[in-house]
């Protein structure tokens, strides 16, 4: 299902979309933008922005439930462990195998789209996470919105 071209595309996106600054207000603005994008999506989504281990923004659209919260927890763990998108973790696992114990732990980690790393001034600082759509659509909505916000700050 996945290939090296997708892995390269994800790596380039992660290496490009890095913030010079990102604070509490940015978390609110980005989270609100993700929620607004989710309101236009065909299914409801949940949104979370984490910075320095703190959840600075979290919102659940009507129709989401505890399952979405559970998926966001898994995606957050995956992004925090890898410093990459949760989709990249899925692609690498499929292409190269589950070599590390965490790569076989689907109870605690997510191997699907919906988690994006937040790098600030060159350092990994947190994640933007959504849940609710089919995972590739989660990834697309998330990446498009994060990239748009990043471009607005340049």
Q: Predicted regions span which residues?
A:
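General "foldedness" signal
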Residues: 48, 61-63, 69, 130-132, ...
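Sensory/regulatory domains in signal-transduction proteins
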Residues: 97-135, 140
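Extended aliphatic helical segments
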Residues: 17, 29, 47-50, 79, ...
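Juxtadomain coupling helices with adjacent low-complexity linkers
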Residues: 1-33, 37-39, 125, 131-154
